[in-house]
Amino acid sequence: MNRRPFWPSFWRLARPYFVSEDRRAAWALLASITALSLAIIWVNVQLNTWNGAFFNSLQDRKFDDFQRLLVQFAGWAVLYIVLAVYQLYLNQMLQMRWRRWLTDHFVRQWLADAAHYRLSLADFGTDNPDQRIAEDFREFVDDTLALFFGLLSSTVSFLAFVGILWTLSGPITLAGVTVPGYMVWVAIGYAFAGSVLAHRVGRPLIGLNFRQQRYEADFRFSLVRARENAEGIALYRGEAGELEGFRARFGRVVGNWWQIMLAQKRFTWFSSFYGQLAIVFPFLVAAPRYFSGAIQLGGLMQIGNAFGEVQKALSWFVDAYVRLASWRASIERLDGFIDAVERARLLGAGLTVREGDVIAFDTVRVDVPLCAQTDADAVETADDARAVAAAGAVPANGVVATRPLVAAGGERIEPGRHTLVSGPSGCGKSTLFRVLAGIWPFGEGECTGPRRDAALFMPQNPYLPVDSLRAALLYPHAPEGVDDARLREVLAQVRLDDFTGRLDESANWALRMSPGEQQRLAIARALLQRPRWLFLDEATSALDEDTERAMYALLRDDLEATTLVSIAHRPSVAAYHVQRLAVTPRAGGPASLALRPL
């Protein structure tokens, strides 16, 4: 769990929206809901007075007063309903506006400076960012508003009804000592005892709720991973292993849920007893005055109602305890998530990548986190990232224990000089691409990479959004502005003729297309975007050699102003390059770079 004090963590999450560009609407809605809440309390005070008169009319058998009071009640009821409906409506409006702003604000931070990628490279003490963004922000907003307005209503209700209860209850003499407004002191003592006991009984729920969200997210992530890799699991016949993994993860969900059930069972024993006793308790305490004739039935009912309002206001902590536990857990999770994003963005301070028209490695040293997995090129998936995370938690200053991977010494790639990057698996070739892309944070020194708007990086497994084929072709740009005829032409060039009539079809193309088709779609993207620099990280590994040669010839001939920089293992690819950047591992030290003609 996060170790930051609770209230600074809360303020860090709550303040930004109310000073944002949407602050006027936020404060207007907050003020309106507050006004409606106060108006509802005022109606409750009027109904308390009505309550006394109504029951007195019953006791005195005054039918005319009875009829008149029923008409009054109808008016108060209509007013109460209108106020309650609009209070709920405006509350939900504020919930959605606040959640929308929070989600957009923190998703932008998560995506900025490749923080979302860097979070996968080391253990920052957080997990499942999708859970944090999709669910915890919703819970934070909903719980904050519910608790704020609940506390506000309880405070104002106490102030409104404590005077009524003081006046109606009168004094009581015990052992020769007269206690004025004795019902007020009884209500305070009753609520105080309940609050202390509620905290003692319900405290374990805070940690249990925190862990439950984590276990649920881990289980859901494993299901998504299985769905995305269904073919591989089926081919390996790994269903039995997956089932065991699912059972183990869901077992943690169930085990923690049992603990929550037991904790909530204990708390419900207490809260139910406390709530049921509160119904009859004021009448038991006030009964002597009623039977002595000091008050009428209406006065007794007013006392019961006022005591209930005061006791309910003072028992806010008891009634809201479960929600408070969930609220605190969500704030701790979100604060840890924001800390992790900020620390991830701090990484890379020692590695400077300038933008220019050439690639120059100067005196850069590229590092990799210390962990069991030494193949930096294999950090592609969530599972691989978890292996890298074995390096240990990232301290608050964002420093990660690393080892040198590649050391450069002034190698330069000039525009127009198609370059093949070669070397054994795991020596750091893909990591060099990540450095040039500006997303790899581990290392020291300076190097020059292409301008971001002039470069396109093509990984071995291209990303295909779940969207139309048109959007997948033009990713990451908006799917407008390119003529359909041009899109069909490019698809035909990369031998995807069967897809030319499906531009507006939406699908999960990563499942609909074979790996080779996906790689050819990525090549089609390059033909459309026409970058000055094109980096291919085994981007044709799923193609047969004839198709691979055809694709490289197409790139070379069609993109005359583009410099190709390729990582590939097939010797045939060398024919489409003029020089080789060799990455050579060295025993006991980082790999070296050497640029040679082909």
Predicted regions mapped to residue ranges:
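A hydrophobic transmembrane-helix motif
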Residues: 35, 39, 48, 79, ...
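Primarily ABC-family ATPase nucleotide-binding module
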Residues: 125-126, 338-420, 446-451, 489, ...
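ABC-family ATPase nucleotide-binding domain "signature/switch" substructure
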Residues: 472, 504-598
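Helix-to-loop junction immediately C-terminal to a conserved catalytic motif
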Residues: 437
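Cytosolic ends of transmembrane helices, especially the final helix of ABC transmembrane type-1 domains
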Residues: 206, 217, 232-238, 281-282, ...
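An intracellular "coupling" helix at the cytosolic face of ABC transporter transmembrane type-1 domains
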Residues: 137-142, 208-228, 234-281, 323-326, ...
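Conserved "ABC signature" C-loop
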Residues: 462-511
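Membrane-integrated ABC transporters
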Residues: 1-44, 53-73, 87, 91, ...
